[in-house]
Amino acid sequence: MAFLMCAGPARPQSPLPAQTNQPPAQAGGVSEKGATGNPNKSGQDSTSASKPAGAGEEAASTRKLRLGPLDPSTPPTDVPHDRPIIGLALGGGGALGLSEIGVLQWLEEHHIPVDEIAGTSMGSIVAALYATGHTPEEMQHVLTDESVNSVFRITPPYTALSFRRREDQREVPNAITLGLKHGVSFRNSLLTDSGLNELLDREFLRYNDQTDFNDLPIPFRCQATDLNAAKTVTFARGRLQDAVRASASIPGVFRPFEMNGHEYVDGAVLENLPTPDIQAMRADVILAVSLPLQPVGKGDLDSILGVLNRAFAVAIENNEAQERKLANVVLIPDVSGFSSTDYLNTVPLSKRGYAVAEAHKAELLKYALNDQQWQQYIAHRAARIRGPAGTVLSVKVNAPQTDLKEIAEKRFAPLVGQPVDTKQIDALLAQVRGDGRYDADYTVGYDAEQPDRPILLVTISDKKTGPPFLDVGVNIAAQTGGVTRASVNFILLDQDLGGYGSELRTKVDVGFLTRIESEYYRKLGRTGFFIAPRAGISREPFYIYSGNARLSERLLQQGGTGVDLGWSDGRKQELRAGWQFQNINWTVDTGADTLPTYSGNAQKARMQYTFDSQDRALVPEYGVRVHTDLGYLYAAPNSTSAPQLFTELDSSRTFRKKNIFLLKAEGATMFNRDVAQPFRYTLGGPLRLSASAIDQYRGTDYFVAASGYLRRIRSLPAPLNTSLFLGGTYEIGQMRSPDAPTVSRQDVYFGVIAESPLGVISVGPAIGNGGEHKLVFTIGRLF
């Protein structure tokens, strides 16, 4: 992971001269390094062919900046004239850049002003926060463990998913998603960017999409790498969130930031320390915080990723050595013991930054102001901080489909006339993104006549790689002396087929269970109602037992079709009712038993309800999930018709962060009707009497209940956000049937449970009161 936190190799670049007499060529929005041109009186480069800011992409504000994204900018003019202008350059380095907060704290405590600031990568986030008026103490509250965990996510939170995507994640919790729109393609980043976007939108809400960065409380610049032009660019105006988002787009970790047909990634790829930007802003004194090249550790070069990581770091260091030469004072914090992924160590890393500033005290104090000058500096900076945003003036939505646009407008309409609530906006955007079909973000602008009332521009766009999408995962359940059930699972999804929200979902399982099942989910208007025809075939082995002795292996082959009419709120619940037709073959494959072979058709009328408020598909920490199926089996030859009722309840509750209490209850009844064997329920296996073999007991009426306790013994940091648990369960269950003795069992299970990219991995022994005992191992679903 350390490799992912480093930018790519640097391109050699000559340092700029110490004195510059011409205005620097920096972007309006973005400017290329080395561009030339003389601004005219309006601030527009007379030789520029670029369009005004926002051209090619709709802007939220009604008032536009005169300079376009690639037009040169001028140095700030609202700077001190009675003392040296002090500029600060903050370099990138992943989490190690958090040490820069401590440097800022030391500078403030010793009355050393920062008149201009620039940053790259993590340095751009710290620099932008400081430039907009955040104190070092406030930054530590912004960059908390909670916010870091929300930024570094491999997948969206389970609670942000739509109902159908939650179903998919529960079935294949370890899925790798492939896009099939342009052949087979993986996504272009390890992490999702919604958490990063939400953090930046929240902190920079007051600054709209037409901001001149010279007008911030501290004039600001940040760098990014233009992948199309293979150049470093400097953001000097436009939307502050976009500038920082581009600069912090670690290649391979976050997807590139796209603007006007160009894609931008971490500025550290070509220029990690933005001292040239500070020089171009005409600072008299340049201070720089540069993160050191870490020594090679034991085993660092023993893998491909380790070698790549070191190669990138060496390339960056070579270029950064030249950039340090432009600074009057270079601060290199001692960050030994930390890595570029230690984002949960904001305070300890800040202390390292404070310490390096203290070590350079003699060099820095000559730039300190007296108390009166410092108060004047603070007052001037505070006067440039924008006040809180007023109530929302309007919401505009851009979307690729008319239906989607109208639905989004309806969802966002209640925001008009209300104070801006970024959490509410993020929740609404999550609803748009929750089906996995679209990307969504928003921009804040202002009207020229009502400059204190924000305009929200919501932009919804198609994902580049799909639909269709293909999820691929595995599920394994194994027991000693029992059965190993392993399958590779596929979910093929073609969305908006026949209209917004409609989809064709095909599930394919290969392994112990072989299955192909397709459902066309067709929305009926915008009421939440739907119709869902389906068809499928399956082949699954079942083992027949007498007590604990296995008698035979039978094969259940099914093929059928059906249709449901239902309603869903799209988030937590779904109700459906329908009919299904099945053709069933139930035959002996190996061994011998006394059960009759069955072949024939059957029909079933059914009603299902599902409610899901749990927070995770792996090990839920809170919430409830209830699934109920009420049906009537009929028209089955050589079998009694029977009503059927099945209910499953899962509940989780966390106490003091490390203790999770689980309750699982499951039961079904055919009201003791003597139905044919292939229609009967089964019981046994992990968390369904764990000490018994999988599906060991067969009958018409059963229940099983399990209460469990998990103790979190270790938490893995972002982006994995997973945990390792020790725990156990107590299970009690019973199986009844009209033609066999009732079986009652009690089990205990204890073991290790780990959340992982492969799903839940569990291993542990189970002991039952009937002489049963098993060692249980699972990968994928939690039992």
At which residue positions do the language-model features occur?
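Patatin-like phospholipase
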Residues: 13-27, 32-120, 128-442, 446-447, ...
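Flexible glycine-/small-residue-rich
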Residues: 224-226, 236, 333, 397-401, ...
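Conserved active-site loop/cleft motifs that coordinate metal ions or position small ligands
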Residues: 288, 330-332, 725-729, 760-766
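Bacterial N-terminal signal peptides
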Residues: 1-6
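Gram-negative/organellar outer-membrane beta-barrel architecture
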Residues: 423, 428, 435-608, 614, ...
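C-terminal outer-membrane beta-barrel translocator/porin domains of Gram-negative envelope proteins
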Residues: 434, 440, 455-457, 467-481, ...
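Sec/Tat signal peptide C-region and signal peptidase I cleavage site
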Residues: 8-12
